[in-house]
Every structure is written in C-alpha cells, then in structure tokens.
Amino acid sequence: MASRITAGATDLVKLFDTDVLIEHLKGNPRATDLLLEASSAGQAACSVLTRFELLAGMRSNERSEIRLLLDSLTNLDASSEVATRAGEWARSYRRSHEGISSIDYLVAATAEVHGADLLTQNVRHFPMFFELEPALSED
C-alpha cells in the first residue's frame, strides 16, 4: 500500500489520522477494513491529538461509540521530541503551506518519532512526507 510514510512496510504501527477514523465512524468500508486489519495485527494507533479532536467534535449520541473506538487504539503521546520536530516543520512549511494546523504538524511528528505509518486522506496537510498518498484510495 502506497499510503504509508515508508511505502511497502508492513510491520509498522499504523497511525490513524482523525479523517480516516471519522470515515470509519461514518461507515466507509475501506476505512473500516484498514482499521480492522491494523487492529488484528496489534498495529492500530492514533495520536493523543486525534483523540482530542474526536472527543471535542463529537455529539452526545456519539460518545460511547467514539470512546470505544479510541480505547481500542494505542494512543501515542506527544512528547517534547514530538513538539520539537513539529515546531521545526512548522517553521519550514508555514509560508508555503499556510493551511496546515498545529495539530497536523504534531500528528506528523508523532508518526515520525514513533516510527509509524501515517494513514490520512489529507495528504496536502503533510508535505513533509513526500510519498504519502490518500489512505482510502483504491490500490
């Protein structure tokens, strides 16, 4: 699958970005398949920032489903190393890629620091990963 930071790697943790988890919650079968595949291999993870985004944006009637999903994933912390790397990227890309949020920089740095494959649909938010492709595209 070419949607990985390190294309072709199969044994790395899969770091699910918020958009892919939302697609799973909306019933997108491709997102669900990716999540189930990673979960069955013990490789499904999200950043604590993705956890924050989902919890902050959920409706009351979604609470139990979202918490169940988040609790089933390994939550990768945003350490000082992650913050430093994210800051370096923000400084490098802030003029050429104005729409990238601080959270996206931190998610990207989380993937790099933890050696994880980033699975996202928003590849334009992650210019630091040159070979990154949309996670839900058909192979």
Regions found by a protein language model. Give the residues of each.
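Short, polar loop motifs at secondary-structure junctions
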Residues: 59-60, 121-124
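Active-site regions of enzymes building and remodeling cell-envelope glycoconjugates
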Residues: 73-74, 131-135
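Short, well-structured N-terminal submotif of metal-dependent ribonuclease cores
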Residues: 1-46, 55-68, 139
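A general structural signal for well-ordered alpha-helical segments in protein cores
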Residues: 31-32, 51, 63-66, 83-86, ...
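Active-site neighborhoods of divalent-metal-dependent phosphate/nucleic-acid chemistry enzymes
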Residues: 2-10, 74-121
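A conserved hydrophobic position in a structured secondary element of the catalytic/binding core
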Residues: 16, 46-47, 78, 121
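Alpha-helix capping/helix-boundary segments
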Residues: 20-21, 50, 82, 107, ...
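Generic structural signal for small/hydrophobic residues in well-ordered secondary structure
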Residues: 17-18, 54, 86, 111, ...
